[in-house]
């Protein structure tokens, strides 16, 4: 076998170089644009030993039980970011107790966020008038189902929200959202 000298080896042409440069640039931009899309489909990491996600306030800061209880009176239902970032109501059951369940605030009719009406002691959807009692059970349509529930636990003063898989205590049925 004979070896070619450096003058006999064909160099990379300008066209081939520009094609490689363009391909590399387009590939880099495409991967950079697809990263957030792919990351959206990856569920958040579990926090706490209960396997839930940390409840967060409107700014995305983790909620502590002591801080929440000091600023929310008994019977209060206020929104936090729960599972999958869905708005979820935390319920204050006493001076020093957060309820063991949270209520997903997404209406089962068309997906509107349902506000708590403390004067009427129920959740009232502003979109089409669906109403839910204080536990999230549907009492007036057009919503076909009760609001979804989530387990709420407190570990080392941190509040965690996890998937509700037990029987729905409001209806006695298997949860429709699980």
UniProtKB/Swiss-Prot annotation:
Major localization class: membrane
Disulfide bonds: 112-127
Catalytic activity: 2 oxidized [plastocyanin] + a plastoquinol + 2 H(+)(in) = 2 reduced [plastocyanin] + a plastoquinone + 4 H(+)(out)
Binding site for [2Fe-2S] cluster: 107, 109, 125, 128
One of the GO biological process terms: photosynthesis
A GO CC term assigned to this protein in UniProt: plasma membrane-derived thylakoid membrane
TM stretches of this protein: 20-42
EC number, as in UniProt: 7.1.1.6
The record's free-text note on cofactor binding: Binds 1 [2Fe-2S] cluster per subunit.
Any one Pfam family match given in the protein's UniProt record, by short name: Rieske
Family to which this protein belongs: Belongs to the Rieske iron-sulfur protein family.
Additional notes on this entry: The Rieske iron-sulfur protein is a high potential 2Fe-2S protein.
Protein's name in the database: Cytochrome b6-f complex iron-sulfur subunit
Taxonomic source organism: Synechococcus sp. (strain CC9605)
Gene symbol of the encoding locus: petC
